[in-house]
Amino acid sequence: MAIAHLVTQKVQEVHFTNKLTEQGQIQLDSSFTFHVNFAKDGKRCIAHIYQSVKDKEGGEKLFASVDVIGAFSCDGIEGDEDKKQVHAQCYDQLFPYMQTVIQNLMQASGIPGFQLRKAVINPENVRVGSAPAAEEQPAEPSQPRFPIV
């Protein structure tokens, strides 16, 4: 079985706006992207997660985005199926760091107890070694953005 070990992570970029004027509930949209690039020897990989949250009225009242990169060492990768397993493991290990950054931003801006919903990454749905479909092509290769529902 292939295993990923988080070696280090860093916040690459953060954007935040809070122009809420009154207390109460607000409807939010959330989207994320996640991809993993493997070294040719299969012993290392870099995972990249981007998450954004904004108000459903266009993001002018509330917007937060965090871009986090993690470096992993990998054991037992022998093929594409192993890479799919590691892909899911990298997300599971990197998500809590990204979640903490967004929680701290929200807490500091007067929105306590904010929680993002963690996606379930099914290894069977992971594409290995293929570019995204034309309609999913990111504006910038280093920061793709795809919506989730």
Predicted regions and their residues:
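N-terminal intrinsically disordered, cationic/polar leader segments
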Residues: 1-93, 100-103, 107-149
